[in-house]
Amino acid sequence: RRVAHDDPFGAWEVDLHGHQVVYRVAGSGPPVVLIHGMVNSSRHWRPVALRLAERHTVIAPDLIGHGDSATPRGDYSLGAHATVIRDLLSALGIGSATVVGHSFGGGVAMVFFWQFPHRVERLGLVSSGGLGPEVSPLLRSIALPGASALVSLAGAERVTDGLERAGTALRRRGSGLGVQLQAIARALRPLGGPGAREAFVHTLRAVIDARGQRVGAADRLYLLEAVPTLIAWGERDRTIPIEHGRAAHAAVPHSRFVELEGAAHFPHLEAPEALAGALLDWIAATEPASLDDEAWRKLLRRRASARPRAA
């Protein structure tokens, strides 16, 4: 069912397993799936999605617990989100796609590839989580007991409005920090609702604890050599360090690394033209992967070997 009419990046909704999932669609052509990060939504992809839609069908879901999708008491793990995306694509009749994820969404995108490799033609990671333990102190603090009050404060209207006003003032003065403050304000606004706050805390604690990111992809990065991989990062990212992206690029043969000038942790909002251009160039320059069970088995057996267990 369509929700938003006369919008080139219009919203639709579908019931999956008894829960409402909202997603946005634009354009026509080979499919590209855009997966947002924590406390973001499909709306934040708009400027990038509209550029990609010139050549592609773009599908951007609101993850469960985010945006306008349902906020049930349930499983907010990376694997659970990946399964919902699989079922959404199946409901839409899409077999495989280029999959791009930002921040937490990058972790979802990687897990989606590991769980359903035959459905991923290319993999794009934008300021992605899961590539190293370091993460901002603010996110680590939210993993601590009793942090719900901090989340409530962060999503308060007076806080987000203040950030928006400060960002507008800085942009008028020509400061790049203004765009970053406005991006943070947009990210925090959904936390104004109690259901979204609870979902955010559950989502964050599934991947982050007081010491940093506790779910990592380092032991499986070798699998990405089987799929065209783009790693894009904001040069000023202080939430997840750009060194994670550089290290992942070095570990994944034939991957492409793009450093986005002037962007911090939200390149799709801070440098949308540069990010969209990088994605379009990468898609045009690569052939889609097509992995069947036999190809996946061969890839795994390069690192895995069965042997009798010692008594």
Model-derived segments and spans:
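Conserved HGGG/HGGXW glycine-rich cap/lid loop of the alpha/beta-hydrolase fold
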Residues: H19-D68
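Alpha/beta-hydrolase fold catalytic core
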Residues: R1-V32, E54-H56, I94-G95, L181-Q182, ...
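Catalytic histidine-centered segment of alpha/beta-hydrolase-like enzymes
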Residues: L260-A276
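Acidic beta-to-alpha connecting loop that harbors the catalytic carboxylate
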Residues: S28, E235-D237, G262-A264
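Hydrolases whose catalytic domains are alpha/beta-hydrolase-1, hotdog thioesterase
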Residues: V108-F112
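Flexible "cap/lid" loop of the alpha/beta hydrolase fold
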Residues: W114, R122-G155
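Active-site loop/oxyanion-hole signature of alpha/beta-hydrolase fold enzymes
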Residues: L16, R24-A26, A60-F104, G277
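Conserved serine/cysteine hydrolase catalytic core
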Residues: G192-A250, E259
